[in-house]
Design a protein with these regions (language model features):
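Bacterial Sec-dependent N-terminal signal peptides
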Residues: 1-32
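Active-site-proximal alpha-helical
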Residues: 53, 171, 176-186, 194-261
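Multi-bladed beta-propeller domains
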Residues: 278-300, 330-332
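Beta-strand C-termini and the immediately following turn/loop, strongest in propeller blades
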Residues: 315-321, 331
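Beta-rich catalytic cores
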Residues: 135, 301-303, 323
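Juxtacatalytic substrate-recognition/specificity segment
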Residues: 28-163, 169
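Short coil/turn segments that connect the beta-strands within blades of beta-propeller domains
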Residues: 310-312
Length: 332
């Protein structure tokens, strides 16, 4: 009897072990899967002094142009970062956005609105060719700023490591990439800042850091760095970046400028208000109409309004009181 019981327990334990191993195997298969790729891309490598450009395009002139622009951006960024690449930086270029979304160089899904990605550990820049050369050049310059940022943190030898990037607010990281790839003056960013001034909603640095969902880091970050560069010069940018990586932006402000982040917020806000207030002097017309749909009587996101033919109603898309977007009707 004891032998039968022992055999039963032995078989039971064997089945448990097989089940556990099978689950682990299935889990490994699930998490080890690559993204769906619809065709094989035969990449080639174009070497430049500082980059390995991976491409599969048959357009030789485009490849040479990308290689040239990469080196141009390197020279520009190197002057500000005061850093050089100890090894060539990989740049992986896709012919279009759908094929870029299938890349396995970056883990995770890539959204339609993502223009490019820079991977942290190897600083691999992954991007598609955009619709026009100006957009492609901008995305390339933006992503190469991130490559420099990662290299400074990992290889700069200034008591920083990659995990120090967690101390740097998103608006500071992305704003710097926009500032170095676009410059001090940008009509698109100015449009955002004029809107913030008109609505009396110029944020403090604390709000930018804690409410990035309300204040787009790219635009507000670029505006802040433009203020810093115009007021103190671009030479203070890297000291502020490094100190922020080591201690956080609030302590970094004190070490670099001698006053706290709230004072810096006030100076930035005053400069913004003075700049856009002067533009209103030539404005004689007043906004026509009243606000029918806003965050107080609808959702936080209200888009695509359409007025009925008789002008009595307006329909719009909103996430009001819902987990997803739906169609709503309001009196006009």
């Amino acid at each position: 009897m004891d032998r039968k019981i022992a055999n039963k327990w032995g078989r039971f334990l064997l089945l448990i072990c097989i089940g556990v191993l099978a689950c682990q195997h299935l889990q490994a298969q699930y998490f080890g899967q690559n993204k769906m790729r619809y065709k094989k891309l035969n990449f080639k490598v174009y070497d430049t002094p500082h980059f390995n450009l991976y491409y599969y395009s048959d357009n030789d002139s485009l490849v040479r142009w990308l290689a040239k622009e990469s080196e141009v951006w390197y020279e520009l960024h190197q002057q500000v970062f005061q850093d050089t690449f100890s090894r060539k930086n990989p740049v992986i270029v896709y012919n279009n956005h759908p094929e870029f979304q299938q890349t396995t160089a970056i883990s995770g899904e890539i959204s339609v609105g993502t223009g490019g990605v820079t991977e942290a550990f190897k600083q691999r820049v992954v991007m598609p060719i955009m619709q026009i050369n100006q957009q492609t050049r901008h995305v390339l310059g933006h992503e190469l700023v991130h490559a420099f940022q990662y290299r400074v943190l990992m290889e700069g030898g200034d008591s920083t490591r990659l995990e120090n990037v967690a101390n740097i607010p998103l608006w500071m990281v992305e704003g710097m990439a926009e500032y170095f790839s676009i410059g001090k003056k940008d009509a698109f960013t100015s449009m955002w800042m004029r809107d913030a001034y008109a609505n009396q909603d110029i944020p403090s640095l604390k709000q930018l850091t804690e409410e990035s969902y309300n204040y787009f880091p790219y635009r507000y970050g670029q505006a802040f760095w433009s203020f810093i560069g115009s007021t103190y010069g671009d030479t203070v940018i890297m000291p502020l970046f490094i100190e922020t990586a080591k201690y956080g932006y609030e302590y970094a402000m004190r070490r670099v400028f001698g006053y706290d982040a709230q004072t810096m917020s006030t100076l930035w806000k005053n400069t913004m208000e003075n700049t856009y207030r002067s533009l209103n002097k030539d404005t004689t017309s007043r906004p026509i109409g009243i606000s029918l749909i806003n965050s107080s009587n609808a959702g936080r996101m209200n888009v695509s309004p359409t007025i009925s033919p008789d002008g009595r109603y307006v329909v719009y898309l909103s996430e009001q009181d819902l987990f997803s977007i739906d169609l709503f009707l309001a009196d006009a």
